[in-house]
Amino acid sequence: MVTIKQIAQEVGISSSTVSIVLGGKAAERKISTATQKKIFAAAARLGYQPNMAARSLRGGSGANELVVAMFWAQDFRASMMLRFWDGLRAEIEKTARPVRLVIYPYVNDHLKESEALTSGANCHAAIICNASYADLQFLEDTQLPIPVVLYNRVCNGYCSVNVDDLKMGALAARAFADQGCRTAAVLTSSPVFEGMENRMHGFRLEGEHHGLTILTNRYCENSIRGGYEAVSHRLRHEWKQQLPDAVFCGSSAIAHGALRAFCEAGYIGEKLPRLIAVGNGPEESDAFSVPSLSVVYLPMENMARECIQLVLGQLDGRITTPESRLLPIEYVPRESCGPLTEYAAQ
């Protein structure tokens, strides 16, 4: 195992300075950025990992155990965590070395306050989910002491796993056009990361390309209640005289609320607008709703598997430079909207 003393000898700096930097205390001790970069580069080159053997043994775990932190935002996305967690667990079960997952909830824009991430004293590596613009800026400006993988985000210097968000929106618009829709509304919450904006941008561009008129978007809460209240309000006002032919929802939760509101108002069967959601909720909930919900499916479980693979690859030295993986997405037609044509599906 590589020691702090060996790193100090490699770069010609005192062991105490190396310890401060690797412990995440460089800023408060006013250690220069150049010195920090030298230390982190040497640590990566030599294969240094935080020594948590004693901590693990005190907790009843073996010294060989890897501790991987999962940082997840404390907001509307908390309910989506289970699918991601299931993907992590499925991949970890295939590994020979024991891995312990630890969840660290955090508040968007305040990732920099997570000492477990900046100190490197509590985990060997981290997977960061739901990072905001401010959080990504913090990551870009900071040299962290442990390997980090980003879920559905891109940031210079970090490994990441993503999907094509523009295509997610485009697939929904194409499906509506193929079903003969001429007008479409959007139900989504305020964007908290670039991918949300890209989905709506892709939807608008593809829709306009196919002659689909996109109605003015008004944000709603990203929840079942939010979708229900948004549709109920519109049915009393701008949709009172004329419904849109189609509705694109930014999440499964919003869509389920929307379906409930339409049903209560008597819009069922052929009276119901075509409806597609970004499929980020439990697949069973989408498949067994009434009507069953058509989605552009977000492959969260597969993305989680790729995240843990990147973590383990960095820890064992197989991955030494930032690597980004782009996973495929698909449109899953169900009762709320029909399939793509053969041409559009290509």
Predicted feature residues:
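Flexible loop/turn connectors
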Residues: 236-346
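Hinge/beta->alpha junction and helix N-cap segments in small-molecule ligand-binding domains
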Residues: 73-83, 102-111, 161-171, 187-233, ...
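N-terminal helix-turn-helix DNA-binding module of bacterial transcription factors
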Residues: 1-59
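Conserved hydrophobic residues forming the short capping helix/wall of the S-adenosyl-L-methionine
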Residues: 43, 92, 207, 235, ...
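Alpha-helical recognition/docking segments in bacterial nutrient-uptake
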Residues: 62-174, 178, 235-239, 253, ...
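Short acidic/polar active-site loop segments enriched in Thr and Asp
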Residues: 66, 124, 182-183, 213, ...
